[in-house]
């Protein structure tokens, strides 16, 4: 029951968003919640790539090291050309939406809002964060969001404190990041979306092309053996064939309308022991003092030598 709460919440947010902007082109990071206990497979692949087949660049910025019980920013960058559009489920052109997933080490989590700085509050305005599940507060999801205004998504992260949690150790930790723009090519059910290039299942000749009332196209193809095959192309992709064209098996019948894609990367952060920092500072101070004393001693010796005429 606990695991259903964030899923239901995500579904509610999506439903409200659809009512506000029905023509949007969604990036669905929360779909993974409904199908996978863990969004990262044993191979290291984030499961969003199972539906978003195109590979695109995703970047991340995190501090090299952080102190215990401190708030820091993990920034996910989802670059693409401004004003890029793609097709929605009804075939119309719409702006790209973006989404992101950040898989933090155990103990790290979304920082409570009362610890956000004014800068973080400004940078996260309009962004809604959800946990992957009730049990996995270290896995955070964002999206869908309007892409042109959210090419950089800031995640406010709270680091754990080994002094209050004995399961946490100081050291280096991995962070797994995924960023998506646009709709996928495969639904979680395994069906293809209209955000695909469609190909001929067999070789033959196009005998007819009929437009459907919802924008789809029904293509009849006759093979050399006389078998007639029907290919239904949903609204959106542009047809590349016409009647009497001969096509080979696997030949494209449409253009590829997809302009989005998914990318992932791994980065690292060090949970730094403040005692080591204090020790390092003390060492630097000691070295600096030693150098100063050596310089003073050298000058003193030079004065004595000068006075003695050496």
Swiss-Prot record:
Q: What does this protein do?
A: Component of the cytochrome b6-f complex, which mediates electron transfer between photosystem II (PSII) and photosystem I (PSI), cyclic electron flow around PSI, and state transitions.
Q: How is the cofactor bound?
A: Binds 1 heme group covalently.
- Supply the InterPro entries for this chain: Cyt-f_TM (IPR024058), Cyt_f (IPR002325), Cyt_f_lg_dom (IPR024094), Cyt_f_lg_dom_sf (IPR036826), Rudment_hybrid_motif (IPR011054)
Q: Where does heme bind?
A: 28, 48, 51-52
Which regions form coiled coils? none
Q: Does the keyword Thylakoid apply?
A: yes
Its recorded name reads Cytochrome f
| Protein's cellular compartments | Cellular thylakoid membrane
Got a GO cellular component term for this one? plasma membrane-derived thylakoid membrane
**NCBIfam families recorded:** PRK02693.1
Q: Give the record's subunit note.
A: The 4 large subunits of the cytochrome b6-f complex are cytochrome b6, subunit IV (17 kDa polypeptide, PetD), cytochrome f and the Rieske protein, while the 4 small subunits are PetG, PetL, PetM and PetN. The complex functions as a dimer.
